[in-house]
Regions:
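Polysaccharide-binding surfaces and accessory modules of carbohydrate-active proteins
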Residues: 1-229, 245
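Short coil/turn motifs at secondary-structure junctions
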Residues: 123, 137-139, 266-267, 378-380
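Acidic/glycine-rich phosphate/pyrophosphate-binding loops and surrounding catalytic core
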Residues: 213, 218-226, 263-281
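Glycine-rich, acidic/polar active-site loops that bind/position phosphate-bearing ligands
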Residues: 246-251, 269, 321, 370
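Short Pro-Gly-centered flexible turn/kink motifs
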Residues: 249-268
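Long, charged amphipathic helices and adjacent flexible linkers at domain junctions
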Residues: 277-289, 294
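Aromatic-lined carbohydrate-binding/catalytic grooves of carbohydrate-active enzymes
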Residues: 289-389
Length: 389
């Protein structure tokens, strides 16, 4: 089975699966490709040396890191905790449906009392996105530790690139050859870090314009895990999913958990090819046609010194040179006279703005500009009412 069907002559990511048949095991992924033309089916890149499903299961004799890790827990008649069951499910296909751009595979393990839905969708520009949804169909709770999408690597993709970094040194690429074992990148900030949630595998020496490459990226703003796993049998792949804390996801009867969407993009023309694919999709979104305004942020101009007359003069000058959105930055909220206090108290400080922000907002609007307001909701100062309360 080839999914999705050919619909564009540009370079498109393809995923080839064994046919998902009712009652069979999860379909194997035979290869993930980027075609330089719609007629390129006879010249596909190499496939994985051994096909693996989009969810790694040890019950299928694929001894990479399992894609689902968890166990069922219950209490017996004496009140003792029973755990350690349903930790290695074997899913069989129960239903499939889809169209040219979508494929959904439902599977279940009646013994483990778990149901799995895998969704695949092709996006404009060639990017493919995949996610799993796990449902507990049993009466006892299921403690889920991990649920990851597995993307197999063909044996010519032997080099990986990911990113590290820090403030003012963001997105520093680091490269290495794939070796037996696991290369693990975890983000524990509760948000994407400077290193991002990206893993690229490619032919040796790939660069912006050359080489066959495949990108795996999580469309997710929380904790994440990306791992490249290869065993001594030359089975290799990238696993991607949310990094779950202990007992963070405990599924009661009929409760479900969905992974973030995992984006898969491939190119036969280096990193620029995968960038072009993602950009094409982003430009197709309903929000994209909106005009991006010219923005002035007043931070460097006034810092914490919020003086209405000065800010109004900046607004008048901004309007004269064509600024379309005027943004008031740090310093407008409670206690915020320097960077040691106030974060978390997101209300207008009456000592600085006795009439509120209305005079400035009205003036900006009369000058024909939008008004924007800066705040940093993920941060807090110990010297704030929010923190003390």
């Amino acid at each position: 089975m080839l999914f999705p069907s050919i619909s564009d002559t540009d370079e498109i990511t393809r995923i080839t699966l064994t046919r998902p048949t009712i009652g069979d095991d999860l379909p194997d992924v035979l290869g993930v490709f980027a075609l330089s033309s719609a007629d390129g089916m006879d010249d596909l890149p190499k496939q994985s040396p051994r096909p693996t499903p989009l969810l790694v299961e040890h019950s299928e004799d694929v001894f990479l890191r399992p894609g689902i890790r968890g166990q069922r827990v219950s209490v017996d008649s004496l009140g003792s905790l029973l755990a350690g069951t349903a930790w290695s499910p074997r899913f069989v296909v129960s239903n499939t449906f889809g169209d040219e751009d979508h494929l959904t595979i439902d599977a279940k393990d009646d013994d483990a009392q778990l149901a799995l839905r895998t969704e695949l969708e092709t996006l404009k520009g060639g990017t493919l996105r995949v996610r799993h949804t796990l449902t507990n169909t049993g009466d006892s709770e299921y403690l889920l530790d991990a649920l990851n999408v597995h993307v197999p690597l063909s044996d010519d993709l032997t080099e990986i690139m990911d990113f590290t970094g820090r403030h003012e040194h963001e997105r520093d690429p680091q490269r290495r050859a794939i070796a037996d074992g696991t290369w693990l990148r975890e983000c524990r900030y509760g948000r994407p870090g400077f290193e991002g949630q990206i893993m690229v595998a490619g032919t040796p020496g790939f660069d912006f314009g050359h080489g066959r490459v495949m990108l795996v990226q999580l469309a997710w703003s929380g904790n994440s895990t990306l791992e490249v796993d290869r065993n001594s049998s030359d089975e290799a792949g990238i696993n991607a999913g949310e990094l779950l804390s202990p007992s963070e996801v405990t599924l009661g009867k009929d409760e479900s958990y969905s992974t973030p969407w995992v984006m898969i993009t491939a190119s036969n023309a280096g990193l620029d090819g995968i960038s072009a694919s993602l950009h094409t999709w982003q430009r197709s979104l309903p929000e994209h046609p909106a005009k991006q305004p010219v923005i002035l942020n007043v931070w460097e101009g006034v810092m914490f010194d919020h003086n209405l007359d000065r800010l109004l003069e900046i607004a008048r000058r901004a309007a004269r040179i064509g600024v379309e959105r005027y943004v008031l930055d740090d310093g407008w909220f409670h206690l915020r006279r320097d960077d040691h206090a106030g974060l978390g108290d997101w209300w207008v400080d009456p000592d600085v703005w006795p009439e509120g922000l209305t005079p400035l907002v009205d003036a900006v609007h009369k000058l024909g500009m939008e008004f924007g307001l800066w705040f940093e909701p993920e941060m807090v100062n110990p010297d704030s009412d929010f923190y003390r309360e």
